[in-house]
Amino acid sequence: MAQNVGLQILEKRKGQVVQACGIGDEDTVAITCDKPSVAGSVSQRACTYCGSRVVLYPISDALHLVHGPVGCASYTWDIRGSLSSDRELHRMSFCTDLRENDIIYGGANKLRGALRELIAKYKPEAAFVYSTCVAGLIGDDIDAICREMQAETGISVMNVQSEGFKGTKKDGYLAACDTLSRLVGTAPGPNTASDRSINLLGEFNIAGETWLIQKHLKEMGVEVVAGITGDGRVADIRRAHHARLNVVQCSGSMTSLAKRMQKDYGIPFIRVSFFGLEDTAKAFYDIANHFKDPGMLEVTRTLVKREVNRVMDELRRIRARLEGKRAAIYVGGSFKAISLIRALRQIGVKTVLVGSQTGTAEDYAMLQSICDPGTVIVDDSNPRELSQLSLEKGAELFIGGVKERPMAYKMGMGFCDHNHERKIPLAGFEGTVHFAREVQSSLLSPVWKFARRPL
């Protein structure tokens, strides 16, 4: 049975930190999750605006305009390492730069002028206008302005209702999915997608990961109608309702869109993970099994066997060097954490601490059932908790994002970036080897001999 941890934490957060008792344990304590951050806890979560921005950002032929202060735009500029095979308009940061006078008199004219100028200059396929806290507080009618500019310019101009004060980045995911749902299904013409077609939801082409996955899907005979939103195109998203299956990789950000498309268009969806050898193989098998095509299933078996054999020798060598090492994990979504635990276990690394910013009760129950005895599981944690627990559990490596990097280095431990700022592909079979190499080089770097750990 999962147990509460003895660490001194805020009273209202005690249900968000538990300790698992072992693999296969089904008698678990339900971790408290999916709730607003406790005041004073210094949460690592980002705001609603940031959540919507990271989801829509990879759509590379759309204009992304932030209606708010310049700080909001600069904070999220190039926020994902999402690559594009065509235009790179998404990598340019545009902002209406609301200031004191605009708060008094309104920013509507600034927004109209910015949209006119940018659409005329860059000729995007669509425009997303991100509402920020300031825009929401002064009451600009952004919806009306978007409708006006859409009629004037002839392209879709969409208000992303992402005022930061609404909640956390999880609420931003919902705002982004709501915006995407208004774009899906607007393509003219007949359905030209094949009977074995899918949409890739929640795969953001970080460091080219979408291309690695699509290469194998093409070999299986699967057509990818739209990447939502990795290497995304407005035209592809418009016709995404033609696909026969939605494959959801980042379930936290895209499950709501998948459910909506299931309701509106009858498209089923499956949750998969392309991180780690075991989960990557399962993802391709799940796709093949959905289409009930014996030929596709046989091709998939051959593909998986070939790719696994290609990487296993190196993974065994890395495991021999890392056996018994200990790692801590803190990422955005709990579904990703499940794959990371399995991937680390394959190279001999034990997970002693795992958590996420926006995990669900279902995913945390799964985490508790697969964790080793004594593993601490946290929801919506903060630097103090993460650093203290990492040191107490003897972690030698921290896997997280840009916010956790300085914390790990201050503790004198290795760090592996697994969030959206990274530049190395870690998905798929090839990505599994890259991840193992990253873990190995981080853990075995000679620099840690000279780093003094906090007492």
Predicted regions located by residue number:
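An N-terminal assembly and electron-transfer interface module characteristic of large anaerobic redox
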Residues: 1-455
